Amino acid sequence: MIDAWAIKRALCIFILINCVLKLGRSRKITWKPKKGVYIPLDDANGCKGEWKRKGVFFNIQSGKKGKRLKGRKGLRRGLVTRGTPQFRRDKFIPLFLLQDCEHRSLNGKQYNLRGRRCSSPLDVNPRGWDILPPEQPNEETIGERIGERIGEAEQLEDEGLDGGPPPGMEAKKSSSSSSSNNVHSNCSDAGKAPVCSQENIRNFCILAHIDSGKSTLADRFLELTKTIKKKKMQDQFLDMMSLEREKGITIKLKAVRMNYKNYIFNLIDTPGHFDFYHEVKRSLSVCEGAILLIDGTKGIQSQTLNIFMELQKHNLKIIPVINKIDLNICRLEKIENDLLNKFHFMKKDILHISAKYSHGVESLFQRIVSEIPSPAIKSNSFFRAIVFDSFYDQYKGVILIIKVLNGVLTKKTEVFFIQSEKTYIIQEVGYLTPEMKPTESIRQGDIAYVSSNIRKCDEVQMSETIISRDIVHLNAQRRLVVDSDLLRRNPSGEEHINVKRCNIDSSLGGVAPRMERIEREVNLEEIAASKVDVSYPVVFCNIYSVNDKQANELQAALNKLKLNDASFSFKPDVCETLGKGFKCGFNGLLHLNIIQERIKREYDVETIVTAPSVNYLIRVKEKCIDKQLKERLIDASFDIANINVEGGDHDDCNDNGGSNSDDRSDRSGKNPPDGLYYMTSNVNDIPQKNYIHGIYEPYVRTSIMTPEEYQKYIMAECFQRRGIFIKKESMDSHIIFYFDMPLSEILINFLDQIKSCTKGYGSMSYENFITYRESDLHKINIYVNNRSIDSLSFLAHKLNYQEKGKRIVLKLKEMIKPHQFLVVIQAGIGTRIFASERINPLRKNVTAKCYGGDITRRRKLLEKQSAGKKKMFSIGKVKLPPNMFTKLFDLKAQ
């Protein structure tokens, strides 16, 4: 009798085996050969399929010598041909190595993949090897290649089987990629030692107003020159910082080296926001030309005017380009007329492009090659370079971004820093492509990076000049000399040194020093490079760590940020309420916001930022100076002759008033009144009225561009903020207003008001040139429960100090939570209070248990509670929120 359970058991086993077999036919097989598993090709004659690994061919299917590879279970005849195998780096070979085999296409390249189910194309390129030469090698060539590599079969396991493409493939890849990049044969790859002539180097930057398409154009440069592979390409590729991608703006300048035909392009992408204008200035100092990009939908804007003036000051070649011509709202003819009338360009010089769709970018390449000059070449000269940017690397220390002015620099070379008077050994040199790619040497005209294992951030200064160490040394008196007998003082009292000549015609592409002396003497000023333009901070505030234990971490973070941002400055400061902190200087509120966010993200330090302020000039009465104030004046002493000072408040704030001259020289050279001056941004350092003659606040020349229909709103807003009208200019349907505005008035919310008045069509920018004007300013103190909060004190003009004080008090009332005691918030000038608000205390219902009886019992409980509240009012501490200053003073990124 047949057992039913046995039948069921056999049926289940049959189904299970069938499923396993189906799974085996459809599964992806990743076969990794090991020692003893494969058979060299010459030992398996007549096999139907071969694989190549590091120049050695192996069979993976059975041949005449064995139906199964030794020691490898499961690799029976035909098993690998089933299903859709997953091919790894060592799993494919070019088609011409195996004749009469089925194949599939891989990105335009054909590879052998013998089997019945090999009709669908591969969707990924495991290695990215390029097409091998079309001509097929004969059998003798293949046999010789196999014979040369057959001895490496036993070493494959030790060398690792995933370690890169075979040598033959590698060579073919490099040759193919060089041809695909359209690079001339005498120009090397960006990561290798340069062999291009210096006449073929083009150093240029892209400049424009905010949101004009600078980063998009930089993407097209990277894409069309094939500097970045297509699969790695993404929008705004050079904006690598997370903050840049979140906010959609460029914060830091980015240098990148590209190859175009037989030319080398050193491109610098710059920010557009005025708070990062110092990045633009540093870029112009190391370039020979610039692309002036104009938004085709908005035309010339206020920042465009400042950029054009800066380009003229540096005497750089300008290529005007109108972007976004693919949009229907592009005003091409109008913008062309504005460029012709305002900037006096020729119509044939103006290019029309669409950076998004690469239209016209190739023509821009030709203009760069033909119009932007190559760097100045000084043959037979020692190495000299200037530092224009730097950043800190965890493993390599301080990385310096330099421009080589003359000479050649190689690794392991000893160099001398002129400003810091220190010597370092170069550990690594290379190019930014945009990643750091080491090379053997860099030469004059190149924009490159160097690493010397510098661990202290304060040892490197912006505009530092680096020269060869073998031409100078320090004697016992710490003086710069070449040899002990070469430094001498001539009758005129000037110091000179002699330098060695260098032969740049070395066959190895390097520099061989020659020992003869040059006849003329080189002055020290000639060796030091001209300084890179650096903007000085205009906004100041104090930064404290929320946790006092992180004060040292905050200092280390600020040191590294200063290394990467030359316009940022800081010095230690101590506050009674907030502890140890730092007084920091910024170029604007957006700059402040970015620095605070970078401290939090990159260094994991929570910070408290105080109210922003500007530098005020104080004229003190010498007879009324006490000892404490005198000590403070000594620390803050400076040369008043270098400050442009104008006396008295100006009443010419109307359409007809003010000067009609825009010449900067008219605003300089004013002689300040005699007296003792000092400068401070800390309101608490300003003494009382009876100790000073006056307070001078900074004014800046501000340009505002607006459509004609909104000009009355712009005028009203500027006069409300105490602006002094200078002049106005007409440009087609737009008007440009020039005002001298108090710096403290335009920092907070002024741009927002301009955008609001003009429905988003207005733009604003201001110059760095500052004039100090005497103003009737009052120090406003903020009191919380009769205690002055020094970090909340600020200066306000007599016209609007009451309005500002009341607004601060009302905001504090909204931000401070109720306490167990009464909280009184007041604003006053000295002892005179002009604004006050109260936050009632939290109260417990102490009379809830009284259901009847005499009223005295109820009154007694209330009086006891009131007495406790009064006691807490005198000894209690009010808790202020840590983000109070940001909300209180509207520290929004302009």
Swiss-Prot record:
Alphabetical GO biological process terms: positive regulation of translation; translation
What taxonomic ancestry is recorded?
Eukaryota, Sar, Alveolata, Apicomplexa, Aconoidasida
The catalytic activity of this protein is classed by the Enzyme Commission as: 3.6.5.-
Domain tr-type G as annotated: residue spans? 199-376
Instruction: Specify which residues bind GTP according to the UniProt entry for this protein.
Output: 208-215, 269-273, 323-326
Q: Catalytic activity annotated for this protein? A: GTP + H2O = GDP + phosphate + H(+)
- Indicate where this protein resides in the cell: Mitochondrion inner membrane
Q: Keyword set for this entry?
A: GTP-binding, Hydrolase, Membrane, Mitochondrion, Mitochondrion inner membrane, Nucleotide-binding, Protein biosynthesis
List, alphabetically, the CDD domains matched.
lepA_C (cd03709)
NCBIfam families of this UniProt entry? small_GTP
Which GO cellular component terms are attached?
A: mitochondrial inner membrane; mitochondrial matrix
Q: Which HAMAP family match?
A: LepA
Q: Which organism is it from?
A: Plasmodium knowlesi (strain H)
The primary location reported for this protein is mitochondrion
Residues of the region (Disordered) are 157-189, 649-674
What terms describe the molecular function in GO for this protein?
GTP binding; GTPase activity; ribosome binding
Q: Which PANTHER family does the annotation name?
A: TRANSLATION FACTOR GUF1 HOMOLOG, CHLOROPLASTIC (PTHR43512:SF4), TRANSLATION FACTOR GUF1-RELATED (PTHR43512)
Question: What additional remark is attached to this entry?
Answer: This protein may be expected to contain an N-terminal transit peptide but none has been predicted.
Answer whether the UniProt record assigns the keyword GTP-binding to this protein: yes
Q: Which PROSITE patterns match?
A: G_TR_2
Q: What is this protein called?
A: Translation factor GUF1 homolog, mitochondrial
